[in-house]
């Protein structure tokens, strides 16, 4: 429960900050061009019965804007006079146009008002990434330094890769770091026509088609490629199956129930198989039988193997901390001065945007549609503990995501309004208000259906039905 609350708090804080500044971008340009902003709210003030849904609000003197906070923590909004938006204030649109209204302003001013939020989100992301570079620097594990090489799945081996190949680079350039979170490593392989590896001390080239589908690389388990990390115990937690069986730090797990184990990927895969078996067991006796396993362990400093019988926890945990890349390799640490951090942050932010846009095309496939997530999926991106580096890095990523999603040409989104404004600027013909209202309804319907679909995916994943 504590983990859930920590993630929820991070999610609400990040989304609220991003939406607040996004809407602030709209308001900035609106007020700059003399457009009246009627309301600017953090969280939505959805009314319930006679209650208007406002936690508090105020209206400064000599200001036409009501500022406040609603109760529904899903972002916020600003209501601009004379604009057809999700409020569907058609009564206002029936009245005589006023000089302070959005609809009476030149198309170029309305365009800047509409893209103001996206601009703020993108600039904010670059600024956050720059400050992250300044405060924490950039720490990563260089792929070519991983002397034990990679562990490949069957699909990768069919293309010519072999376990323990050290990945050097592709025809597009050398590999930088391994990170299956943003997919840059896999994207480079998917787009490559040649991958260079170091095999048994000799350079070897593998020919690839150059247009591989990246989605299976990161969705399939085991992954297409991942660093070879031996199944060595980093540390043992107290009063756990491992501690009771005599397993200690430095021990190597060699097999589980007769199945060979070389890496933690192997171990996790086998416990995953047990999890599938456990899911269909109905009795306590049957579940105990599944949890009862036989491990072959090579204790630290010992030549012989030791066979251990133990009972895994109900969630099939051994009770150890696994060795990681940091157990075997020294990360590259790049530090930046205040002024050096800006070009580094901008470069990183641009790469994140380029990768996100590149991955977007996969959503058109069946597997890609299944990967769409709602509030639960976004919240799970945050760590189950409070870490400022992770929080700001994820906030910057969400800011880029919010900017890109909002600029999509869907009515009700900023991008939809931009399309209509560009049409007006090119043809000198303004779409009718009746058409704009209908388009807004269509856009809202699309967004609601997408939100239902995304959150339904979250529920199905939570129920292990996907």
Positions of PLM-derived features:
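Alpha-helical transmembrane segments of multi-pass membrane proteins
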Residues: 15-19, 79, 121, 125, ...
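Juxtamembrane extramembrane loops of integral membrane proteins
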Residues: 83-90, 102-105, 148-213, 238, ...
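Functional transmembrane alpha-helices
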Residues: 2, 96-107, 220-244, 249-255, ...
